[in-house]
Design a protein with these regions (language model features):
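Short beta-strand element of the alpha/beta-hydrolase
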Residues: 86, 97-108
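Hydrolase active-site cap/lid region
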Residues: 224-274
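Cap/lid segment of the alpha/beta-hydrolase catalytic domain
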Residues: 110-119, 135-189, 243-258, 264
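Serine-hydrolase catalytic core
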Residues: 279-303
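Catalytic-loop region of hydrolases
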Residues: 23-97
Length: 303
């Protein structure tokens, strides 16, 4: 009798009621595992990289590699899907063992016309000086993110914050479909893949822990790499403090007289400002905001 009653009840549940139930479940979905799961999935694949150059600089040996770090195109809407990162390793004379500094660097695979652009956040001279002064192996991971990227339905290829903002728009538009759409996910994965390369190439230095740094969105990627990869021993992000991101953005808006700073324009342009305070934005922040990881099994990495 109970089974029959349940069956009859199901016949009269409206599609709207079913959609509401799915929506309620979606509100509570745990997204803090997404970046870590993505990183782990890449470790099951052979590492694809090649040595481009070795050259001796005063006080430091520089080794340049090309790393095909991953294939990333959520639902096939992003191209090119293969990510290529430059990995430059600076080994100073009498290098210290165990720890290496990893610099998440900018640069472009192409500038829209097929021409690569060298990284400018940290150049070769600066990285060499850091390695020599600290006797620390320094690893630069460039083209993070890969750019420019073409998104289906968008006429102009996107780079930097324009690309991040559009990836957020995809996620917010359909969290279930585009759960892995945030550009910070492959950005963090690029760094973890560079760790794998470094461990293979730096056996003499016995490197097994990494101090990760980067500027702006690469600083954000440094946070997320530290949370998702146990090989990170410390993180030094060069970025504004946006921990507790939703509250920070609300405070920013009020501080600018109920307006946004110029640097926020790519996100304003994609309508992200209209989503702050919504359940959809809160779901995005479960993946993006480092403080949301405090009460997870990764929370100890923030302490």
């Amino acid at each position: 009798m109970k089974i029959r009653t349940l069956y009859m009840a199901m016949l009269f549940i409206s599609p709207a009621g079913l959609a509401l139930s799915a929506g309620e479940n979606n509100k509570n979905i745990d997204l803090t595992h997404v970046i870590s799961d993505y990183r782990i999935s890449l470790t099951s694949l052979p590492l694809d990289y090649s040595l481009l150059e070795k050259k001796q600089r005063p006080g430091v040996m520089l080794q340049r590699f090309n790393l095909n770090s991953q294939t990333w195109s959520p639902q096939g809407v992003v191209s090119p899907e293969r990510w290529q990162n430059g990995v430059d390793i600076y080994i100073p004379d009498s290098a210290r063992e165990k720890n290496a500094l990893v610099v998440i660097n900018n640069g472009s695979n192409n500038n829209g016309s097929g021409t690569p652009v060298a990284p400018t956040n940290f150049n070769e001279e600066e990285l060499s000086r850091i390695a020599i002064a600290t006797r620390t192996v320094v690893i630069s991971v460039s083209n993070v993110p890969n750019q420019v990227l073409s998104y289906q339905g968008v006429t102009t290829p996107l780079g930097e914050d324009n690309s991040v903002a559009y990836s957020w728009k995809l996620f917010i538009g359909d969290t279930h479909k585009y759960q892995d759409a945030s550009l910070h996910i492959p950005m963090a994965a690029s760094v973890s893949q560079a760790f794998r390369l470094a461990k293979k190439e730096l056996t003499q230095q016995n490197i097994n822990k990494f101090i990760v740094t980067g500027a702006s969105k690469r600083g954000w990627a440094a946070w997320l790499t530290a949370l998702s990869d146990p090989d990170v021993g410390a993180v030094v992000p060069f970025a504004m403090d946006l921990l507790n991101t939703q509250k920070s953005l609300e405070h920013m808006y009020q501080s600018y007289g109920k307006n946004w700073p110029v640097a926020f324009y790519p996100y304003y342009n994609q309508g992200i400002d209209q989503q702050v305070g919504t359940d959809k934005f809160a779901r995005l922040m479960r993946l993006e905001d480092p403080l949301t990881y405090l009460n997870t099994d990764m929370g100890d990495r923030l302490k």
